[in-house]
Amino acid sequence: MEPPGPVRGPLQDSSWYEPSAELVQTRMAVSLTAAETLALQGTQGQEKMMMMGPKEEEQSCEYETRLPGNHSTSQEIFRQRFRHLRYQETPGPREALSQLRVLCCEWLRPEKHTKEQILEFLVLEQFLTILPEELQSWVRGHHPKSGEEAVTVLEDLEKGLEPEPQVPGPAHGPAQEEPWEKKESLGAAQEALSIQLQPKETQPFPKSEQVYLHFLSVVTEDGPEPKDKGSLPQPPITEVESQVFSEKLATDTSTFEATSEGTLELQQRNPKAERLRWSPAQEESFRQMVVIHKEIPTGKKDHECSECGKTFIYNSHLVVHQRVHSGEKPYKCSDCGKTFKQSSNLGQHQRIHTGEKPFECNECGKAFRWGAHLVQHQRIHSGEKPYECNECGKAFSQSSYLSQHRRIHSGEKPFICKECGKAYGWCSELIRHRRVHARKEPSH
């Protein structure tokens, strides 16, 4: 019997691929985990995907939900949850297996992807896993969608390491040294970068020195030097290079020191550490990266509020918190003049003026202004009712419905008529009662 041919369309033949209330609940749990992760990483500039609305703009807890364009991020979150789920986190073996199925489906999306695409996801994941540690951050920073793209990134990196033909030029004496000229050729820095492609046990230099020299190769590689170096635009430092350098710098004890002449020295065990001259712009870029490195969290909350004693991992979070005490609201809406403590709250508020509704339901296409409203709406499709009454066990899809239901047990009547003082448990009852007074009023 011949084996079946490859499946070309999305996989749809298993019942546990279908969306369920369990899948929606897991999506919400993973979204909360994503928001906490982003907060720990100090990514203040990232857009907050899930907000509770303008009435809760002062709350510091914000949630994240998946949007079109953020699919790769959420897919990576589900992949990590699938790989790192622990048995102790689940009520029992059946629940553990069920949650793994849900996370696997949300990561690989068999209802959307073909068998070949799913195999490519798995091969790419394993390929990135077997890469040397020094290259994993580099390749992941390019967000490859397939194994071929990952290989292309590595091949491009290797091409950059190929030695260039030496062009003879006039010798320069010490008096002719330029402000940002290296005393040795660029080939030494590129050679240090090539060391990162070797296995760890064969690397002749400490990690920090490799990263430092690699960083120098990035900020100085500009091809042939022009005659007028004063007008040369400084090579920019890319986000990926910054990330790689910061990660390596955080794991090493070497010290980088800037002298008053703009010369950066690497104080390292190797006595042959290079001495390099940079332009002021390049030195400032390096200083900014060192500042970013100092913000890398150690897990300790070292930043304490002098007003209330609350502590934070990031100093930037402390600055935002202190506005609660000072009342400062530096972000102002240009349309209505309303002010806010955080820029993210201003961005949410501006949706009222623009009419933007970025949160769209995948089931019916209905759009919402706030992520919380989308979550509530999706419970209509999933049938999820997470809010349960402690008195009678009745469940509800929204917390407001549960609050209204509890008045039946408590006898609370918060809606009071201003005319006669009569109280009601429901707003609709008060509205009907007011019509009685309206009919009794004499007509003019």
Swiss-Prot record:
Cross-referenced InterPro entries: SCAN_dom, SCAN_sf, Znf_C2H2_sf, Znf_C2H2_type
Expression by tissue: Ubiquitous. Higher expression seen in the liver, testis and ovary.
Zinc fingers (C2H2-type), renumbered ranges: 303-325, 331-353, 359-381, 387-409, 415-437
Documented effect of changing A150V: In a colorectal cancer sample; somatic mutation
Chief localization: nucleus
Keyword Zinc-finger: yes
Family membership: Belongs to the krueppel C2H2-type zinc-finger protein family.
Name of the molecule in the record: Zinc finger protein 232
Organism lineage: Eukaryota, Metazoa, Chordata, Craniata, Vertebrata
